[in-house]
Amino acid sequence: DEDLIQREDMVVTVSHGGYIKRVPLSAYRAQRRGGRGRSGMSTKDEDFVANVFVANTHTPMLFFSSIGQVYKLKVYKLPQGTPQARGKAMVNMLPLSEGETITTIMPLPEDETTWNELHIMFATSNGKVRRNSLDDFSQVKANGKIAIRLDDDDALVGVATCSEDDDVLLAAHGGKCIRFPVTAVRVFKSRTSDGVRGINLGKDDRVLSMSVVRHEKIEVEERDAYLRWSNANRRGEDLSDTGLSPERLAEIAEREEFILSVTENGFGKRTSAYEYRIAGRGGQGIINIETSDRNGGVIAAFTVAQEDEIMLVTNGGQLIRCPVHDIRIAGRNTQGVTLFKTSDDEQVVSVAHLEGTEDDGEDEDEDETEESEVNSDLDAE
């Protein structure tokens, strides 16, 4: 009986290769963060920890797959192990068909009566988007159910919770992107629709990723003045005549988000989200990053914080871990800088976003936050 399952905080760890496990949070509380942390998962050489979150044993999780299916499990159903254990392959836990992969794992509020207050946004490789109430996924059978109907040449590339105070950013392989308000997509009642057009793609282009970006109410003149000021700051120049007060500059800077873009040949850059103007849904979009034979097409684009890290994976099995703060901030109309020197026959095929994993190398007090202790789990990978 589910009521007999003890309520306990768990650290859920997911590897890039599709292995998952849960570990009691208490197993991490005894770990001080003075060095590089502890081993977080025993993985193959080509695998690594790609996602970590803290959840209660009774927290429901939705697993969205590349073919548009959704599966549901509560945390206590996951295999429990030690911090060093590899976990269990999701393909052996969920009724996945051949070639079907899990693209998004979403922990949800335990109180399902609140789900009707939350929305979920879908994005497909053909540029379609759809918004539903999260409550539409409160009942999911053991064999899963359709989350979104996809054409044979389409795939689900992103799923995220959102509010009507957010924007959606779609990034395409050819270097274009589009940003539009969540409210530009009506709330669908159906799960079998493929949604509406989010971006008008060029021939043979495809959407690689979707990000939910905070909607900012900022005048164009303010935005442009701030960007001139911040660019001058990074160059070490003094630009005092911005027309904005120091308080307003600080306020805009405090709310600034950055979009990280990575290309097939190992190039990347960070760009202020203020550079991505809000447009109407369904347009052709604007330049996100200049693509060429030198840097290749876009493989991923998403919002990042200064303390995050990314992991690049190549088709040759090479891995490189890169702190976000080491990646140059540049404008949209640039090719980026080399993050990883690929060989002639090698390309980056995947980029994992490791949130808040940067290690400052300093000892912390014993009453450090649970999140810091969990993040040290990633440092050893």
Feature map (PLM): residue ranges:
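C-terminal interaction appendages of subunits in large macromolecular complexes
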Residues: D1-E381
